Amino acid sequence: LRRWTRRRTRRHRRGVWALVGDIYSGLLTIVVVGTILVPHLSRLVAARPPSSSQEAADLGVLDLDPGWLVLALTMLLLILGIGPLSRLGPLFLRPHEAAWWLPMPGDRGTLLVPVARVEYLIAATAGAVMGVLPALASAGGWGAAVAWPVLIAAGTCLVLSELITAQVQGRGVTCLRRFLILFGAAACLAGTTFPFPRSMTGNVVVATLAGVLVAAGTLRWRQARLVLGHVRDDGLLTVVARSFGAHVSLLSLDTRAVGRLLSPALPRPAAPSPLRLARIGRRLPRSVRVLTGVAQADWILLRRQPRRLLQIGAGLAVAVLPLLSESVGIPMRALAYLAGGWIATLAVAEPARQAWFDGAADTSWPVSPWLVRVGHLLVPGLFMSAWSLLSLAPAMTSLGAAGAWKALGVVAALALVSGWAWAGAALRSGFRAMPDFAAGLVTSPVGSLPPGLVQMLVEGPDAALVGALATALVACGIAAPTTTVLGIQAAAGAVVILWGVRTNRRAS
């Protein structure tokens, strides 16, 4: 049956040499870009001073080794990735394969084994690439260069086996996610106590652990192979439709639709909501009642999506962990802080995205559209203000230990002000306009693109950069926490909030 499918679809394929050419072009691009960026990226990691651990201990701040930091961030990447992977299968078929194969009698296992093999190959390759980072951090020579990629590759294959088992059994990935969270937390705790394995003995321990994981991965693959035929057809058809929808959304450059497809369905409410916030504003003026009503709806939407809280925590980890390592350069800390803030902002931007998908609820309010937009700022502003306070905890701890109470107050005010700037960026990202494919395509070196593509891609990140740059500079130690910086942050936050309220006003 597989041979018949290949014959039927052969004329629609580009051929093996086209695939080889794509792989060659991709590898050549990676090599050229890496050769250009490596000398500059190496400057972002500072030399580890011998007294850094003692100074960090005096300030009450943890000092993480960069190797353990890389491992923790790798676990964080896996934690964020298993949700979308479980939505896409991981076992899946192409639409024509599902149409031709599933109606046939017989065992599904032999049809899905080649798919699983390719996915294991992709998982092992991705794990080996991620394993290069801890190998570079350990500076342990060829032993570390081999042991760490094998270790991470075996770990990703084990994660894939658990995802396949969860798909076959029809259960969620909550247990797997909790295990990865515990493992990442253990890496952070180990970084505060034990040095990263750099010696020959450490490389032997890593190689032994890699061998154990390879054996466990092989055993889990054999177990998963036996149950591949138990995958339900309706589950495969659902995955096929979801994968095809994600592919079409990527072709149309609609990242919001991709995120909606990869997100789990909202749970149905078990009981009516008490609507406490809306009840409080019942006796207030109409404009205030609308603000509280919009905020109440946004809070209900976020409360029904617990994964958003996990995403906010992941953004906090990305922003804070580099601040706890003395070996990470200041520019890299600033980039990590902005990246972590953007990850958290995407989580709290869900109400704005939902309002963009279905604007009927916003148009039903008896006030101006801009006031409804302001209501969508309240819940993200509160969440991101709390996030900013937690992200600036290392800086506030250092200032408190030094007795700089005025600077400590400025940092706390910066956190509160920057939280509303992040909320404005969330509003701008959620309500951004789509490119107009009907207006004709623009020829570019990477192909024909619709007008307005660049504007769509930068709407949101541009506001985040403008609104949070001052706070990021203070968090990384580049700028001192002064009232001048606070004034700059307040002005930038006001601009970003106005920016977000006025973004794509025609959609309201």
Label each residue range with its predicted role.
Residues 101-102:
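Alpha-helical transmembrane segments that serve as single-pass membrane anchors or pore-forming helices
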